[in-house]
Amino acid sequence: MQNYLTPNFAFAPMIPERASGSRVWDTEGREYIDFSGGIAVNALGHCHPALVDALNAQMHKLWHISNIYTTRPAQELAQKLVANSFADKVFFCNSGSEANEAALKLARKYARDRFGGGKSEIVACINSFHGRTLFTVSVGGQPKYSKDYAPLPQGITHVPFNDIAALEAAVGEQTCAVIIEPIQGESGILPATAEYLQTARRLCDRHNALLILDEVQTGMGHTGRLFAYEHYGVVPDILSSAKALGCGFPIGAMLATETIAAAFQPGTHGSTFGGNPMACAVGSRAFDIINAPETLHNVRSQGQKLQTALLDLGRKTGLFSQVRGMGLLLGCVLDAPYRGRASEITAAALKHGVMILVAGADVLRFAPSLLLNDEDTAEGLRRLEHVLTEFAAANRP
């Protein structure tokens, strides 16, 4: 197939054509077990019937009406997010990048309104990932994504992840916000320690700064709770959500307390497609299923099974001996002889009918459907064992 798209993506050799649940079929009719979930997006698998019905029902009512108006689907989804989180208000957008952009802009505006222009510093973590806009890629602590776009926005300090002393040294009276991923995703599925997040909360309170938690990847059930912050006993001031919020239909959201959200008065921020009725209708139905006790229980039980099985595979093949993460967001950390070769393994896995991801050069990432069942898990692991065994035999140091 001729490619007419810009070359910023390195496309896989297969072209997906249809999918159902945790199975994908390409244009040649080959079947794949999907352990990637569209990079933690397809939380209910592919083409979930309830979401298809919700989209079909809404598309016969209202597609788009502009942000001059609110709509029933937007208010319904916002109410569910508020009722099941710390937040009082929700801003809808189209992606995780936009949700984080809104969070960072709100934090700076809130600080300016309350304390004046000198309180604008943002503290973020090295190796974090918060999006692809110029602002969010600058806040993300990975120069490989931002180095080509200088001059970058200023007033951003990066500290090592999980380094409490460095965080304490960085946060001060000029800090308007600290932004953290509860689990660093793109850099290797590395969970924050409880002490680190609790220290961040305490420092923000001490210095009148806001704690922003980026739950674009960890939120919407992936860790076995609706939001990952629930594991830590820490409550943020602002939270970003996207990816699984729409289960494949583009939507993002920024959640905030009422006092902080009040800084966003009419005209201060916006989004043409934010709160789109179709996106919110799908998101609302997805929310009901994701937040159901049986779904979250499945995440925890299947996650434990998958983690145990992956550890066994790693030890059997000698490729990895550590599996990080929570629930169904997991990362296999390649042992020293195989560091830097994660992409080779994911490519080999694809050839053998299993879709997995990388999280940096050294980690194999798994973010499957929250409805993953024993049959799909077993078949995916069977295929993966063949891949890992073959790779280890061909590359034994």
Swiss-Prot record:
Binding positions for pyridoxal 5'-phosphate per the UniProt entry: 129, 214-217, 272
**What Enzyme Commission number does this protein have?**
2.6.1.11
Which sites bind N(2)-acetyl-L-ornithine?
Answer: 132, 271
Q: Which SUPFAM superfamilies match?
A: PLP-dependent transferases
InterPro entries attached to this UniProt entry: Ac/SucOrn_transaminase_bac (IPR017652), AcOrn/SuccOrn_fam (IPR004636), Aminotrans_3 (IPR005814), Aminotrans_3_PPA_site (IPR049704), Class-III_PLP-dep_AT (IPR050103), PyrdxlP-dep_Trfase (IPR015424), PyrdxlP-dep_Trfase_major (IPR015421), PyrdxlP-dep_Trfase_small (IPR015422)
Q: Which UniProt keywords apply?
A: Amino-acid biosynthesis, Aminotransferase, Arginine biosynthesis, Cytoplasm, Pyridoxal phosphate, Transferase
Q: Which domain of life is it from?
A: Bacteria
The terms under GO molecular function for this entry are: identical protein binding; N2-acetyl-L-ornithine:2-oxoglutarate 5-aminotransferase activity; pyridoxal phosphate binding
Q: Which NCBIfam families match?
A: arg_catab_astC, argD, PRK01278.1, PRK05093.1
Q: What is this protein called?
A: Acetylornithine aminotransferase
Organism the protein comes from: Neisseria meningitidis serogroup A / serotype 4A (strain DSM 15465 / Z2491)
Organism classification: Bacteria, Pseudomonadati, Pseudomonadota, Betaproteobacteria, Neisseriales
The gene name reads argD
